[in-house]
Amino acid sequence: MQTPYQTNEAGHLSIGGVDANELAQRFGTPLYAYDVGAMRQQMRDFRRVFEERHLKYAVSYASKAFATIAMYEVAAQEGMHIDVVSGGEIYTALRAKFPMADVSFNGNNKSVEELTMAIENGLGLSLIHISEPTRLRCI
């Protein structure tokens, strides 16, 4: 069975060509390390499937998985949209200067403050609870 995991000549896990043991020694543990090259390739692969078929599309990164300025910068560079689920993720997207027209605010239990933040910054909204239109009228 083939896996996306690579080992180096020392038999250690290699992340983007870097020895994971060396990363742990340098930065301590627990440590989150991502292979940005592999992530970029996956983003391109998703987009290519739609482009080859000449389909109108938007591929969104579900930022609840990992919401940082650096991650949003990579997503923007690769032509991705992002899906946010909290005011904190909206704030991070703003700090990353992510194009707000490419951000969708999803999720349940959105506060009036979060909805206001989303509207004021031009985000798309996914309303999934019956009370959300009522909350929108308060804004």
What do the predicted segments below correspond to?
Residues M1-L125, S131:
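A charged N-terminal "starter" segment
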